[in-house]
Structures are given as structure tokens and as C-alpha cells.
Amino acid sequence: VRLLLLFALGAFVALILQIILPRLLPSGILAPDLVLILAVDLGMRHPGALTAVLAFGMGYAVDTFSGVELGLNALLLTLVFLFAYWLSRVLMSTSTAMGVIIVFTGVIFTDVANYLICSRFAAAERLHMIMPAILIQAAFTALLTPSVFRITAWGSRIVGLRQYNRNR
């Protein structure tokens, strides 16, 4: 229950920031995908069925505020969660460096999938035009990943959750 409350609060704050930041920054592509960072953190460091449902719920919350296709972000965020879970178990590591790599690839995956599905694959030949913006957003989000991981680790300690070894 504490994990659910911690990440629900984190997702709420992340959603507010994701709504406000594009209006405050000079370019909207600099707005990081904070909810995706939380989903990666859940997948790597808090394995379980409840966390998969929580990742889906966070994606659905993103859909309600900014999704074109209802349920698409929920699906994509759940897939990123599962990828983070799988990779952390296969490589037996929950290091921050691996989290940064997963976040970088996760942002690229979700943005490209959103673009292709929302355009009904009609604009696939124009994908090369938006790739620079996607890569910039992925890099900026990846740069913020260690800070978000530290904040979630701090929150986990505050509420008394079990800590997983980061460099297993």
C-alpha cells in the first residue's frame, strides 16, 4: 500500500510537471517524460503484479491528460515497465546507469510508437523529420533519470519500503 501511495503521488506530481513544463520551456521537446522514469524505476526496483498495474494506471493517467488514442500510453508505459523488469532480471542489475539507458530507449520507443499509431502508419516515411526532436527529448529525460531515482529512493526510505541493491 505504501508503494502504491508513493508512486501515485509521484505520478501525480510528474503529470502536473509534464503539463506545465512545455509552456514554461522555450521548446516543448525539452519537457522530460517523468512518468516514464517512474515506470522504469518500478520495473527495475519494485517487481510485482501490483507495480505492473500501477504502471498501467500511470499510463492511463497520461492518456486522460494528453493522449490522442485512449489506452495507448497505458499500453506503451506497461511495455516499458515490462522491458525494464525483464532487463534488470536478465542482467541482474538495478544500477542507475542501466536505468538511464532503459529510459533513453523507452522514450524513443514510446514517442515513435505514439507517432506511428496516431498517424495510422500513414506518415512513416516522415519519421526521419521528427527523430531529432525525439532524440533530444530522450536525452533530456535520460539526464534527469538519476535525480528522479534519488527522489524515489528517498521517498521509499521515508515510507519504510524495502530497498533493493542498486548494483546487484
Residue ranges of each PLM-predicted region?
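Terminal, non-globular segments
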Residues: V1-R168
